[in-house]
């Protein structure tokens, strides 16, 4: 099983090196270029994934109640997901969110997710901070994968010679 995990990690890194274009003439390390490219790609989708996952969780909790609160947001905001996002982040819906929080007393994790996402995405500064924090964590994970891959490759080459 350990060999399988090692192979998966090596294959993942090989795929990353193939997919991400590396500019050898720019003077930046390969890992920096890979981290920057992948980090930006994954960070661009982060916000939509957060809201989409919360929306799905709310639909599973109580679709009719969710629709009741979404209906308070004008249709000009867009589709149901976009109206849900407006409901979660805009200050004008704070009284309605408090009503929703009361209905979620038996579901504290779901209630906290809404509260937390509201705090992370309600102002330009909080959005910037949230996205920057996500990008930094992605960078750490990518570098961790890179270090592990290098360790495996070097340990394997030491064992062979």
Language-model regions: role of each:
Residues 1-161:
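Amphipathic, oligomerization/interface secondary-structure segments
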């Amino acid at each position: 099983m350990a060999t399988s995990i090692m192979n998966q990690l090596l294959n993942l890194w090989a795929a990353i090196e193939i997919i991400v274009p590396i500019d050898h003439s720019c003077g930046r390390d390969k890992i920096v270029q890979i981290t920057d490219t992948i980090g930006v790609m994954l960070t661009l989708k982060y916000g939509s994934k957060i809201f989409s996952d919360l929306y799905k969780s709310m639909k599973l909790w109580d679709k009719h109640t969710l629709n009741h609160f979404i209906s308070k947001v004008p249709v000009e905001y867009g589709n149901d997901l976009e109206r849900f996002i407006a409901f979660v982040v805009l200050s004008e819906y704070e009284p309605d969110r408090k009503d929703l929080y009361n209905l979620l007393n038996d579901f504290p994790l779901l209630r906290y997710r809404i509260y937390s996402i509201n705090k992370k995405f309600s102002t330009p500064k909080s959005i910037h901070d949230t996205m920057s924090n996500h990008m930094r964590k992605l960078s750490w994970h990518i570098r961790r994968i890179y270090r592990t891959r290098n360790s495996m490759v070097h340990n394997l080459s030491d064992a062979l010679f």
